[in-house]
Amino acid sequence: MAIMGVQMVVTLLVASIMQRVSPHYSFGRWLLCNGSLFRFKHPTEEELRTLAGKQKPKAKRERRTNGVTDEKPLTVPKDIDLRLDTQPITTIDALVLRYFLEYQWFIDFALYSTIIYLFTEAYYCVVDAQNEINIGVLWCLMSIIFSIKVLFTVMKHYFRSEEGGERSVCLTFAFFFLLIAMIVMVVRDEYLEFGLEPGLASVCHNLENFLAQRGWQWSMPFVKLAFKIALVALCAFLGGCLTFPGLRLAQTHLDALKMAADRPMLQLLLHMSFLPPVIVVVLWIRPITRDFLLNAPMGKESVELMSNSAYNTFRLWIIVVLCLLRFCLTRFHLQAYLCLADRWVEQMKREAGRISMLEIQRKISRIFCYLTVVALQYLAPIVLTFHCVLMLKSLGDYSWGLYPEPTGFTPVVDSSPVQSHSPTSEEEEDTEDVQAAVEQIMGAMSSLRGLFTPLFFRGLFSFLTWWVSVCQIVTSLFGLYFHQYLGAS
């Protein structure tokens, strides 16, 4: 409390509200159950028999009397005139969905972490709290970790599949992204302006001084190599986790465009929501964006359209707006997925042969049961990108451009020992113990701030934001090609 101050009070208050309010009102549950999404109900056996012109089967006792003992699955022709009934999704319906509780908790946590981050931004604007720990950053970091965890949980579901095709797809894309990450690591900052090398050099310099003051020695080239290997491994892991979200996004994008065939404005918004990863990737290609805006050719002269700091602010706002745009179109993508049931029935009608009633019911019900999986695949990359940008702004000492902010600074590692005074009484001894503990905690945090500089965080979170967009571009473009050409054939 003495260390965190007002931010700790607000954090505890928000955590308490989240625990008490979520069972009664949940933003994640509202996204699915606000009445805007409707599901297709599977037909009953009576309805299928009526459409097929069949009578109700005899009871078991009558079949035994007539000498019929084998029970064959009830089948109907595929070309029956089957029309599915629709029903708005309710909370009772959502409780049977797979991973519904994980989805609800994840969306609610992302919302509350964003609220706390906005509060800390306002708090830092009003109060000079540079020496306090930014609680909003910790919440954003947890949102990033939970986003990756959710994506990994969904990927594990594909690995448990009996067929094994999904597992091969994830491993193939993970290896492919591993190669791309290794290539990106050797690209110079003149082309991809992450700033990883300067940031890593500053960390190694501070770490070398920190260890030298304590009589330790460590090979700094080994630290750089280990960090790059770990980052490449993380890139491959993220690529594998984002494989099926990208493929699913391509499918729902195409289906949503077909649903909005008579709504050109909605089609324009859908196309705009599909392009954000491309725009994010281009924003970090220096010759195309920063160099052009800082030295725009105007005839024989070059004009500076914006400064370096203005471009950094502009880039942050562009990514935030693109994330919000994609989030606002969540309903259309989820409804496009739910309409797969009706589309599957229409495709079945064009086929010849017979199909069991149970298979029809199972296929239609399965599409609805995996709604929350599709929602997680759509929303988790948005949450991941959004909170990476928030971390980039706060830890990278950038500005939103809305209010004057203090310039960032790089703390110097202070290894001076804590001065101790001789106690004169038991009360003074207890007081000094508490003060010593607080000073040790503050010293440890100051050391960490001194090691990991804003320059390092700029490089790290710029790269992570850019890499998530690269994974989405590759997988979604492959998904478009697959669903338009390979899947259709």
Swiss-Prot record:
Stated role: May play a role in protection against oxidative stress.
Q: Where in the cell is it found?
A: Membrane
| InterPro entries xref list | Transmembrane_161A/B
Q: Which residues lie on this side of the membrane: Cytoplasmic?
A: 120-134, 188-224, 286-304, 388-459
Q: Does the UniProt entry include the keyword Transferase?
A: no
Which residue intervals are topologically Extracellular?
Answer: 24-98, 156-166, 246-264, 326-366, 481-489
The identity of this protein, by name, is: Transmembrane protein 161A
Q: Which residues are glycosylated?
A: 34
- Can you supply one Gene Ontology CC term for this chain's record? membrane
Record-annotated membrane-spanning stretches: 99-119, 135-155, 167-187, 225-245, 265-285, 305-325, 367-387, 460-480
Membrane topology is:
Multi-pass membrane protein
Where's it mainly located?
membrane
A Pfam family found in this protein is Tmemb_161AB
Q: Which UniProt keywords apply?
A: Glycoprotein, Membrane, Signal, Transmembrane, Transmembrane helix
Instruction: Give the domain of life.
Output: Eukaryota
Protein source organism: Xenopus tropicalis
What segment(s) does the record annotate as region Disordered?
51-70, 413-432
Cleaved signal peptide residues:
1-23
Q: What family name appears in the similarity comment?
A: Belongs to the TMEM161 family.
